[in-house]
UniProtKB/Swiss-Prot annotation:
Belongs to the SLD7 family. It is found in: Nucleus; Cytoplasm, Cytoskeleton, Spindle pole. Interacts with SLD3. GO terms for cellular component: cytoplasm; nucleus; spindle pole. The gene is SLD7. This is Mitochondrial morphogenesis protein SLD7. Keywords: Cell cycle, Cytoplasm, Cytoskeleton, DNA replication, Nucleus.
Length: 257
C-alpha cells in the first residue's frame, strides 16, 4: 500500500527572480517507521543526463518514490523540462543532510514512461571511494618522500665520491707536476756542477756559489715558458739535450774571463 512521505517545495533561481515549485508529493510503496508527513524544502541545482551518472549515485536497493502534484505550475514545469526521458532534475534538500558526511542530501526527479519518480542520491559509495583515494594519495606521498629521501642520499653519496675522485685526481696531478719540476731541478743542478768541474772550477773558489746560482737562475729563466706549462699540467719535461745546451751556453758566457 502506498503511503505519502512528504511534500516537497523547491526554488528555481533565474533572471526573473525566484520561482517556487510547490506541492510535490513523494509516495512510497515500502513500509516506513514514521507515520507523519513532513514538509521538505529544496533548491534546484541543475539538470543531468541520467545515462551519464556515476554508478555510485544510485544503489540497487535504493528506494524510488512516486511524485504527484496538484499544482498546475509544477505539472507544466515537469512536462516542459522532462520531455527527454534521460533528463533528471537535481534538487538539494535544505532541511536534510547525509548522515555519514553531514553534507546536504540530494534528490533526482525524473520521468519513467508517463510517471514522475525520484530517488535520493546515495553518497555511501562515494565516501568509500574518497576514503580510498585519500589513502592512496597518502601512500603515494609517503612513497615519494621515501624515494626523494633515498634519492637525496644517493646524490650526496655520489657527490662525495666525485669530490674524493676529484681530490685524488688533483693530488696525482700535483704530484706529477712536482715530479717534473724536481726532475728539472736535479738535472739542471747536475749539469751545472758537471760543467764547473770540466772547467776546473772547484767549490773552494770564492765565487763558486755565486756562479752556480746565477747559472741556475738564468737556465730557469731561459726555460720559463716550458716550466709555466709544466706548472699548469700541460707541458712536457724539458729534454736533457736542451737543458745541457742551455747550461753550456751560460757557462761559456759567465766563465769567459
Amino acid at each position: 500500500m502506498s503511503r505519502k512521505l512528504c511534500t516537497l517545495n523547491f526554488t528555481l533561481s533565474g533572471k526573473q527572480g525566484s520561482l517556487v515549485i510547490r506541492d510535490i508529493q513523494l509516495w512510497s510503496n515500502r513500509p516506513t517507521a514514521s507515520k507523519s508527513t513532513s514538509e521538505x524544502r529544496g533548491q534546484f541545482i541543475q539538470y543531468v543526463d541520467l545515462a551519464k551518472l556515476p554508478l555510485w549515485v544510485r544503489s540497487t536497493n535504493m528506494n524510488t518514490y512516486r511524485c504527484y502534484s496538484t499544482s498546475a505550475t509544477a505539472q507544466a514545469y515537469f512536462k516542459s523540462k522532462l520531455r527527454n526521458a534521460n533528463r533528471g532534475i537535481v534538487i538539494e534538500l535544505x532541511d536534510k543532510v547525509d548522515q555519514r558526511s553531514q553534507e546536504p542530501a540530494y534528490l533526482i526527479i525524473f520521468r519513467e514512461n508517463t510517471e514522475l519518480n525520484c530517488f535520493q542520491v546515495d553518497l555511501t559509495m562515494k565516501h568509500e571511494f574518497d576514503g580510498q583515494v585519500t589513502k592512496l594519495k597518502q601512500d603515494i606521498g609517503k612513497t615519494r618522500a621515501s624515494v626523494s629521501k633515498e634519492g637525496s642520499i644517493d646524490i650526496i653519496i655520489q657527490q662525495x665520491q666525485q669530490r674524493k675522485i676529484g681530490t685524488k685526481t688533483k693530488v696525482y696531478r700535483n704530484v706529477h707536476i712536482n715530479d717534473k719540476r724536481l726532475q728539472f731541478n736535479e738535472t739542471l743542478s747536475k749539469l751545472i756542477l758537471g760543467g764547473l768541474r770540466l772547467r776546473g772550477i772547484s767549490n773552494s773558489i770564492t765565487d763558486y756559489q755565486k756562479l752556480y746560482k746565477i747559472t741556475f737562475d738564468a737556465a730557469e729563466f731561459t726555460h720559463r715558458d716550458e716550466l709555466k706549462r709544466i706548472s699548469m699540467g700541460s707541458g712536457e719535461e724539458v729534454s736533457f739535450e736542451s737543458l745541457q745546451e742551455t747550461v753550456e751556453t751560460l757557462l761559456k758566457l759567465f766563465t769567459k774571463s
